From Swiss-Prot:
Family label: Belongs to the FlgI family.
Any GO CC annotation of this UniProt entry: outer membrane-bounded periplasmic space
Organism: Fervidobacterium nodosum (strain ATCC 35602 / DSM 5306 / Rt17-B1)
Gene this chain is encoded by: flgI
Key words of the record: Bacterial flagellum, Periplasm, Signal
Signal peptide: 1-22
BP GO annotations: bacterial-type flagellum-dependent cell motility
Subunit structure: The basal body constitutes a major portion of the flagellar organelle and consists of four rings (L,P,S, and M) mounted on a central rod.
Record-given protein name: Flagellar P-ring protein
SS bond partners: none
Pfam families hit by this protein: FlgI (PF02119)
Taxonomic lineage from the root: Bacteria, Thermotogati, Thermotogota, Thermotogae, Thermotogales
Job description of the protein: Assembles around the rod to form the L-ring and probably protects the motor/basal body from shearing forces during rotation.
InterPro entries linked: Flag_FlgI
HAMAP family for the chain: FlgI
Length: 333
């Protein structure tokens, strides 16, 4: 319906139905084993090859002079007046079970007053773990994304002092992990939920025909390793990962007022209500067919079909949440 028609007083009655359902998801897609986790690495390095967009001041000159001494080249810091280098922080995440020789993606960010890292090359930089040990070494050309285009709002928001080096770090040391605790393993849900934890234990017990799994709380499920797998734990873990569990999608509405977007997931129900907003008077009436109910998804679809703007929809959703008729969490960004 055209926007000019919306200038008229509208009375809308919506009778909306939606089935309640859960999605079957493999355990490996919504959980992980305790002990198998990423670790953060960090280091401080120098990006060179910048075309006058590097750091100013004497800090860089001192660092470069010290670095050159390691190669047997003695240079007075006062003679190194260059803006072609920048001091950067280098960070990376190392996944579990990564072996020496495997590669990691790396991010770099300017520490000082560099204008851009574009076309620069990161010199060899050791990456440390929280324990102070070196686990990887990073080096390579820095990418800061596409070229800035004059007049483009999106591209003007680029940050050329933050860069990325795909597979820019080489793992030098493996981080030790321990998954098995005695004769059991613990599954950790990525998002704690009592219902999903209980269903996970039930699905595992059903798969193996015995009560080997027990939900400890909303985030963890303890699984005893059957004797038949005592010498082949990896095969047992692989079987666990492939078990499908009916997982409820969390009822949540996320609003980004800057971009005018509304994101919603799960079976988000809404109670009966009457709302007057601008030129709209909206009445929601739930049907009485089994366990079906009105949902926010159908409400938003109906509003869009009537020509409501993103700002209109955001305002309506916020008012309904304040009134307590939306059965979901609301996050505003």
């Amino acid at each position: 319906m055209r926007r000019n028609i919306l200038s008229m007083f509208l009375f809308i009655t919506l009778i909306i139905y939606s089935s309640i359902f859960a999605v079957n998801v493999r355990i490996k897609d919504f959980a992980k084993f305790r002990g198998a986790r990423d670790n953060q690495l960090f280091g401080v390095g120098i990006v060179v090859g910048l075309n006058g967009t590097g750091d100013s001041g004497t800090l860089n000159s001192t660092l470069l002079s010290n670095m050159l001494k390691n190669f047997g080249v003695a240079v007075n810091p006062n003679d190194l007046k260059t803006k072609n280098a920048a001091l950067v922080m280098v960070v990376a995440d190392i996944p579990p079970f990564y072996k020496p020789g495997m590669r990691l993606d790396v991010e770099v960010a300017s520490i000082n007053d560099a204008k851009s890292l574009r076309n620069g090359i990161l010199l060899q930089t050791p990456l440390y773990g929280a324990d102070g040990n070196v686990y990887a070494v990073a080096q390579g050309p820095v990418s800061v994304g596409g070229e800035d285009v004059k007049g483009s709002v999106n591209l003007q928001k680029r940050f050329p002092v933050v860069g990325y080096i795909p597979e820019g770090a080489l793992v030098e040391r493996e981080i030790p992990f321990s998954i098995v605790d005695g004769n059991s393993v613990t599954i950790l849900l990525n998002k704690p939920d009592f219902t999903t934890a209980a269903r996970t234990a039930l699905a595992i017990n059903t798969k193996f025909g015995t009560n080997i799994a027990k939900a400890l709380d909303g985030a963890s499920v303890k699984v005893n390793i059957p004797n038949v797998f005592s010498d082949d734990v990896i095969s047992f873990l692989a079987l666990l990962e492939e078990i499908e569990v009916p997982v409820d999608v969390v009822a949540q509405v996320v609003i980004n007022e800057r971009t005018g977007t509304v994101v919603f997931g799960g079976d988000i129900g809404i109670a009966d209500f009457v709302l007057s907003y601008g030129n709209f008077v909206i009445t929601i009436s739930n049907g009485q067919i089994g366990d079906k109910k009105a949902t926010i998804g159908n409400l938003i679809t109906a509003l869009k079909s009537l020509g409501a703007t993103p700002q209109d929809i955001i305002a309506v959703v916020q008012e309904l949440y304040k009134a307590g008729v939306i059965f979901a969490q609301l996050k505003i960004m």
